[in-house]
Amino acid sequence: MSKYAGTQTEKNLEAAFAGESQARNKYTYFASVAKKEGYEQIASLFLKTADNEKEHAKMWFKELGGIGTTAENLKAAAAGENEEWTSMYKEMAITAREEGFDRIATLFEMVGAIEKEHEERYLKLLGNIENDLVFSAGEETVWICRNCGHVHVGKTAPKVCPVCAHPG
């Protein structure tokens, strides 16, 4: 439990995290438009500011205790995706349809289906961690270094790349 639980400060931290996160996304979208319109310098400034906003959001999220181990993060991510597809998007689709916005309702439903896939992906990755399968397979597998591209064939990935010494 967060030391801020139940306080106005907790609400403020959550609002700050949400605001900075939304600003980051908006500035990234704005950068795309500026770049398409030929304003490279403005696009670069939007992206730099988006990076700043990302760090601000991370600060508040960490303060709320939102960042854990990879296994904890996968559990939290799966739970968030589950809430989105089982509740949030279903309810939003019902409301949109009741208000006559069928196209938006359909989009909410379609995105909900994607969120279900996200949950399943996170749970599979969590299972891989829990069963020590991230860097091992039951059969010969091609492992490619994500840094230099070295190809290794075997039942387990090397702990470090023999070419560039990048961790597995």
Question: Can you say where each PLM-predicted feature lies in the sequence?
Answer:
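Non-heme di-metal
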Residues: 1-168
